[in-house]
Structures are given as C-alpha cells and as structure tokens.
Amino acid sequence: HDPVHAGERYTEDRFSFSEPALGSGSLHTIGTAGMRFSEFRIHTPNPVMLLDTEPAETAESAFILEGDVESAFNNMKGTVRFGNQRHNFHYNTDFSGRHTLLSGRFHACTLTYNPSFLDELMAAGDSGSLTAFRRHLDKKRPFLGIPEPVQWHYEMHGIIAAIRQCRFEGLTRYLFIESKMMELF
C-alpha cells in the first residue's frame, strides 16, 4: 500500500499485489468529498471471481478499458456483462455480489458516487435522462442505466485519459481531477 496523499478533502492511494502462478494487479484510487475514481488492473492465467460482501448503497459508472467481466448482485435477477471499451451506470442499495473476470487481462476504471453527494447533484439539475434515475434514487430501487453496456462516447476517452495521466501536483492536481470526474457524470 502506497498512500500518495491524505488530506482533508482529497485522498490518493496505490495498492499492488502479486502471487506467483496466480496473478498480479494494481489498484489506484483518488477520492474527493463526494466521489472516488478507481483504476483496477489484474493479470491472471485463468478467470477469477471477486466477491464484494459489504452491502452498501452506491452509484457507480464503470468503464472497461480491457477484458470482460460478468457481475451478479445479491438483490438483482440475472447478470450484467461488460466487455472491452464498454460503459454503464448503476445504482444499487446493496452493491454486494460477485464479479467474474473472464479474461486473463482486465483493466477498468470506476467512478463511485457518495449517495448524499449524488442526491445533491440530482437536485441541482433535471433532464429527461436523469428523471428516471431520480425516481429510482428517491424510492431506493436499483437502477441500471440501460440493460446492456454501451460503447464509450468519444469524449469519455479523453476525460479518463486526462484523469489517469494528470501531471499536476498538489491541490491543483486534485481540483483538476475532481472537475474531470464531474464531466463524466
């Protein structure tokens, strides 16, 4: 574990792991007061199942850069499958479940929203696409942006690259990253 920054408003951490013959990977997280950007990489010779056992209310955008994953959540029927260069948005009152990484190489970024922060964002604006989501959020019902993950919008590539490759330092770095995270909403 490498704590890069731990401030009052911003945090940044890096983790890496390696087990001979089983696989290796890394996790890079950047947290703000209301959002967390995570970049996850794993390399394994075989498919791997990850369990998320903590039932937490969460909203998350997932961006798959490489590989395939199939997810099943404890309070939803069926599975959701994400592939290379796909994206989706998901809100759930119980984010616990299992995620099966189907390929030996997996690279993804997620943007996780704090529920109270998300509620404030939703109150600030109202558009047709957000209205359906707002109803689910108000009633605490799971919401999947669309039944199937979609191809990334061209602009998303640039925004995610700007976050991942940000060369600013100190407070400027975190203000820049936070503004880019807001662009992804």
Regions found by a protein language model. Name each.
Residues 2-107:
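N-terminal functional module of multi-domain proteins
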Residues 72-185:
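Alpha-helical bundle regulatory/interaction domains
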